[in-house]
């Protein structure tokens, strides 16, 4: 596991060399790009790449383009395009006027393919997909193509007819002529164009041939003036092909490709295919389910842009794959919310507390601080009366050793911001369930401090005024998967699902100040955790809160 502290970014070291006097890009503006495929929602894994691309541009006062990689006609959707834009803006990044689609370059891709054919560096091949595998060879045997020496004019004619739609899918491909004996199979005359009679979400039916990613991507980078094409580690073996393309067609720029390890997180899956299966089979409520690792899911759960950026930056940039504990992501959120979230009182599993010596019908306002870490956030007034709600866990009819909360004839306890109380007994129903707790209060202890300065031996507990509060539904989330590595080879990831990843509590009580709560606000429910109003379901008169993260955890960075 990577050490979760700020680490040296080897990408920046490469860039420093490139822009230094005599370097490849000396005197040039550092220019990166983020090229998501619009066939799904961005997740926390994409977020690392996004922050590397945009963050690198920020560091060097450079530019970062947003380019939708929509060269594959079968997967793209406008819904995903808009969602990706929203997520990037939410994280605090902007691409200015540099928003592009890969499909915008189809005509240029075609022209460069023709250029390669004319140079004798590409040819039309008739091998079927099955034959292609058969002729591919192995480490000791070169690949073979009986069409490699097809005359240039014949390849030009066939390629033009491929574009005109004369042939069915897979009848022909266009292959780069590189090295059939290369130890890197990506260089064994790779396919750079294929026939696909598919409707494209932006180009319509204009095209029936589509460039392969390994051909289109370096051309797009070069045409946009990208200096550093930053991508994940699986493209390391594709770098020779990337370089070959930009060196053999007449593009105006020659970008440098640099690879970094993808972000892996335990207790989750980041495969779009598997995430889609969770959605389509009803294991989660949608792409924005707060248990999902998608940015829209994390946002709905209450994650902040700062916490996610901080997480990605502290994980660092690695050259080899690593898996980061999900608990570290939670740590970063907890760290942020501890500083910024307003403290409020909420009771999730309520039981009534009656202060028997407090006047019936009386109500008063007590002062509670909004955030002890931020005095500038001030205080608020909270109503207090004879009848309160407290947590069931804050009372035991028969106490256990070292229990310091309420029990009959136990020690004084402090009601947060209000008074000291002493439990005198309880009321039970016919099933021997406690339905009401009885206590007396010290009228001279307003604010929680006794007038005589005596030591309070009991705990401080939170409460909600039963005469002035709101009902709420609270959703508490846990890891979506019990298994820390549900994505491992040979595992059925669905069999690893945590059946207790969602607990819905109804009949919760929250203080009246939350009556109009709405996303994206975040709150610390005192002693319980950090919560946020659900962005879809929370509304005045129907309050719904999601637990963003627990109040404490044993996880510490670097462990």
Predicted regions and their residues:
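Long, charged, mostly alpha-helical binding arms that flank functional sites
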Residues: 253-332, 336
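Active-site cores that bind ATP or allylic diphosphates and position pyrophosphate for catalysis
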Residues: 66, 70-72, 115-275, 329, ...
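Intrinsically disordered or highly flexible coil/loop and linker segments, enriched in small
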Residues: 24, 93, 122, 168, ...
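N-terminal catalytic cores of NTP/NDP-binding nucleotidyl/phosphoryl-transfer enzymes
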Residues: 7-15, 20-85, 199-232
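A glycine-rich helix N-cap at a beta->alpha junction
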Residues: 80-107, 112-113, 120-123
């Amino acid at each position: 596991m990577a050490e979760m502290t700020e680490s040296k970014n080897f990408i920046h070291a490469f860039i420093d060399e490139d822009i230094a006097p005599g370097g490849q890009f000396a005197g040039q503006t550092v220019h990166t790009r983020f090229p998501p495929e619009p066939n799904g929602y961005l997740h926390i894994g994409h977020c690392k790449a996004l922050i590397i691309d945009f963050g690198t541009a920020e560091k060097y006062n450079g530019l970062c383009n947003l380019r939708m990689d929509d060269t594959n006609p079968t997967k793209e959707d406008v819904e995903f395009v808009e969602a990706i834009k929203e997520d990037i803006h939410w994280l605090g990044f902007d691409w200015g006027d540099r928003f592009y689609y890969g499909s915008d370059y189809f005509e240029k891709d075609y022209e460069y393919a023709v250029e390669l054919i004319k140079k004798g560096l590409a040819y039309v091949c008739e091998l079927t997909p099955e034959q292609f595998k058969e002729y591919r060879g192995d480490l000791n045997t070169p690949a073979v193509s009986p069409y490699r020496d097809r005359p240039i004019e014949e390849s030009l004619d066939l390629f033009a007819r491929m574009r005109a739609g004369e042939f069915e899918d897979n009848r022909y491909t266009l292959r780069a002529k590189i090295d059939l004996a290369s130890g890197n199979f990506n260089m064994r005359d790779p396919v750079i164009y294929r026939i696909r009679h598919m409707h494209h979400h932006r180009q319509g039916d204009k095209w029936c041939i589509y460039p392969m990613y390994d051909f289109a991507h370096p051309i797009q980078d070069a045409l946009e003036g990208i200096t550093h094409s930053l991508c994940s580690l699986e493209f390391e073996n594709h770098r020779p092909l990337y370089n070959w393309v930009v060196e053999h067609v007449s593009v105006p720029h020659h970008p440098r490709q640099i690879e970094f390890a993808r972000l892996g997180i335990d207790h989750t899956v980041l495969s779009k295919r598997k995430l889609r299966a969770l959605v389509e089979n009803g294991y989660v409520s949608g792409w924005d389910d707060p248990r999902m690792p998608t940015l829209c899911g994390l946002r709905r759960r209450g994650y902040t842009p700062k916490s996610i950026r901080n997480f990605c930056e502290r994980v660092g940039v690695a050259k080899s794959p690593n898996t980061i504990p999900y608990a570290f992501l939670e740590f970063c959120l907890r760290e942020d919310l501890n500083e910024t979230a307003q403290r409020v009182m909420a009771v999730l599993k309520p039981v009534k507390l009656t202060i028997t010596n407090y006047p019936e019908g009386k109500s008063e306002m007590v002062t509670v601080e909004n955030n002890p870490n931020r005095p500038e956030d001030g205080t608020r007034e909270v109503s207090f009366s004879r009848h309160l709600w407290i947590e069931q866990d804050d009372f035991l009819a028969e106490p256990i050793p070292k229990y310091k909360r309420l029990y009959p004839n136990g020690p004084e306890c402090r009601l947060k911001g209000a008074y000291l109380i002493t439990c005198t007994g309880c009321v039970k129903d016919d099933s021997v369930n406690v339905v009401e707790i009885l206590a007396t209060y010290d009228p001279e202890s307003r604010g929680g401090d006794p007038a005589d300065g005596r030591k309070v031996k009991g705990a401080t507990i939170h409460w909600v005024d039963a005469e002035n509060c709101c009902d709420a539904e609270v959703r508490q989330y846990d890891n979506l998967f019990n298994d820390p590595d549900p994505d491992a080879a040979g595992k059925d990831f669905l069999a690893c699902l945590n059946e207790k990843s969602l607990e819905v509590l109804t009949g919760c009580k929250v203080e009246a100040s939350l009556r109009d709560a709405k996303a994206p606000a975040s709150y610390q429910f005192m002693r319980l955790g950090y919560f946020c109003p659900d962005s879809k379901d929370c509304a005045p008169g129907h309050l719904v809160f999601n637990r963003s993260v627990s109040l404490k955890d044993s996880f510490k960075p670097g462990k």
